[in-house]
Amino acid sequence: MQDFAAIDFETANFERSSVCSVGIVIVRGGEIVDSFYSLIQPEPNYYQWRCTQVHGLTRADTDEAPVFSEVWKQIEPLIEGLPLVAHNTPFDKGCLRACLMTYQMDYLDYEFFDTLKAARRILPHLPNHQLQTV
């Protein structure tokens, strides 16, 4: 796959709609051509300790951040027509669906590819398949 958008969401709590940051890398012709990162004010706007332990973000980091609908207006043109790649696709796809539903925005049927699933198949000898290990 030569053209794709790698996408990663982080959440403030265990609600998929509570996205507090998004990172995207655009790849065309096998080369990184663009990237995007934004903090997002989550909905609902509270942080669970376990989530903060994963990504290090707190409410203080996102209190002044834009809401998802504002950030999505910047993201949508970047990823238009590209398949999306994520590590543990059910999580990231679920976050995207939940946020779009929360803000009453249309969900296009984005094509997702899962690097976690691929890593488990291709690298079965690894002790785990977390992103930092792979």
Residue ranges: model-predicted function:
Residues 1-110, 124-134:
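Conserved non-catalytic scaffold segment of RNase H-like nuclease domains
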